[in-house]
Amino acid sequence: MGKNVVVLGTQWGDEGKGKIVDLLTQDAQVVVRYQGGHNAGHTLKINGVKTVLRLIPSGMLRPNVTCYIANGVVLSPQALLSEIKELEGNGVNVRERLRISLACPLILPYHIALDKARETHMGKSAIGTTGRGIGPAYEDKVARRALRVGDLFHRDRFANKLTELLDYHNFVLTQYFKQPAVDLESLLDESLQWAEELRPMVCDVSACLHEHRKQGENILFEGAQGVYLDIDHGTYPYVTSSNTCVGSVINGAGFGPRYIDYVLGITKAYTTRVGGGPFPTELLDDVGKRIAERGQEFGAVTGRPRRCGWFDAVLLKRSIELNSISGLCVTKLDVLDGLEVLRIAVAYKDRDGNILSRPPLAADDFDDLLPVYEELPGWQESTADVTVMSDLPANARAYLKRIEEILGIPIDLLSTGPERDSTITLRGPFL
C-alpha cells in the first residue's frame, strides 16, 4: 500500500523544501506541484551542482520519478519550456516524465505587464511581488475569464477568448497605468509553438494520480512558498495569490483529503522573509547580517536579499494547526553555528503588556507587537554535514529538543547542509 505525503513550508517560504523533496523522492514514484507558479524557486545541490527549479517538481532529478504540474498551478508556457530546455541541456530527460494538467490557468505576457505596472504604480506601498504575473493570472482564474492549457489546442476558441481578454487588459494597461499595450498577433503566433510543444505532455492530472494511488505507488505533493504567504491564512495583504496550506492539495490536484497520510512541515532553524510585511523577530543588527551571510539568504528566483530573524514558535504553532502537520524538518541548523546565544519567540506582547499566544490575522495588527523570547546557549562546534543526531553538539540537540517541547510535535528530519546526504533522518515520512 502506497503512502501520500505532503511537503510544505511553515514560514514565509524559502525553507529548503526543494532539497527535502529531492531527498524524499528516493522513496516516491510520483511528485506533484499543486499551487503557485514560477515565482517559487526550489534549489537543489547534488554532487556540488546547483539546480534551481521554478515550475518543474523537484523529483525530476530522479530518473524513475514521474512529475505532475496539477491544475492549481498557474502556468507560464514560456517559463516552463525555458526550464525544460535548461534541464535537457544538462542531460535530464524531462518530456517523457513530465505531465501537465489541461486545467492549469495560463500566465501570458499581459499578466506580467500588469504585475509590473501595478507594483510601479503602488510605489512604497508595493507588495513586493516577483513581477512574474502570478497575481493577475489568479485574478483571471477567480473572475472566470482565464485561458487554460486546454484552450491552446483549440485554435479558434483560443483566438476568440484571447481577443476579448486582451482588449480588456490592454485598456487597463494603457488607460490606467499608461503602459504599452500587448500585441495580439505576436501572442497568437507564439501560442502556436507552445501548443505544439506542450501537447505530448498534457493530461487529466487528477485521474492519473488516482491511478497511481490504486497501484500502491508513493506520491509526494510539493508545496511552494509557505503558510504565511497563504492568501487566506497569511499576513494579508503581504501574501501570494494562492492557498499555500495543505488544503490546496485537495483543490489544486483533485486529491481527496482522506488519501493524505502524512504532512511534513519544513522550517528553518531561524526565520526569513522576502519583501514587505510584518516580521516580529526580524534582526536588524550584526547577528541578522551574519545569519544572512552564512545562510546565503538571497531569493533563488529574484536574487533579492531575505530578511532574517530568530525562530518564531508562535507562527509555527499556528502553521501546525492549520495544516495538521505530522512532523517537522528543520533546515539550515549549521547557519547558527558560532552564535553565543539563541532566542526563540514563545509569545507576543502588545503595548499594554498583554501576552498573546497566537499571531493576529491582519498584517497591521502586528505593528504594536513585540516578541517574548526564551534564551538558549549557542554552540561553537560545526554542525555542517552531520548525519547522526548524537554527533551534534549538546547545545544544538538541546535547542532542537526545546523546539519540539514548545511546539508539541516531533522533528523527523534535520538538514545540516545543501547536499542530499547532509541530512539526519529520525523518522521517514514514507515509513
UniProtKB/Swiss-Prot annotation:
EC numbers: 6.3.4.4
CDD domains: AdSS
Cofactor: binding comment: Binds 1 Mg(2+) ion per subunit.
Annotated SMART domains: Adenylsucc_synt
PROSITE patterns from the UniProt entry: ADENYLOSUCCIN_SYN_1, ADENYLOSUCCIN_SYN_2
GO CC aspect terms: cytoplasm
UniProt GO molecular function: adenylosuccinate synthase activity; GTP binding; magnesium ion binding
Alphabetized SUPFAM superfamilies for the sequence: P-loop containing nucleoside triphosphate hydrolases (SSF52540)
Pfam families: Adenylsucc_synt
Residues at the active site: 14 (proton acceptor), 42 (proton donor)
Residues reported to bind substrate: 300-306
Keyword match Translocase: no
Residues in coiled coil: none
Cofactor section: Mg(2+)
Record's subcellular location: Cytoplasm
Catalytic reactions on record: IMP + L-aspartate + GTP = N(6)-(1,2-dicarboxyethyl)-AMP + GDP + phosphate + 2 H(+)
Entry binding sites for GTP: 13-19, 41-43, 306, 332-334, 415-417
Residues holding IMP: 14-17, 39-42, 130, 144, 225, 240, 304
Enzyme class: ligase
InterPro entries: Adenylosuccin_syn_GTP-bd (IPR018220), Adenylosuccin_syn_Lys_AS (IPR033128), Adenylosuccinate_synth_dom1 (IPR042109), Adenylosuccinate_synth_dom2 (IPR042110), Adenylosuccinate_synth_dom3 (IPR042111), Adenylosuccinate_synthetase (IPR001114), P-loop_NTPase (IPR027417)
Subunit structure: Homodimer.
Reported function: Plays an important role in the de novo pathway of purine nucleotide biosynthesis. Catalyzes the first committed step in the biosynthesis of AMP from IMP.
Family: Belongs to the adenylosuccinate synthetase family.
Protein name in the entry: Adenylosuccinate synthetase
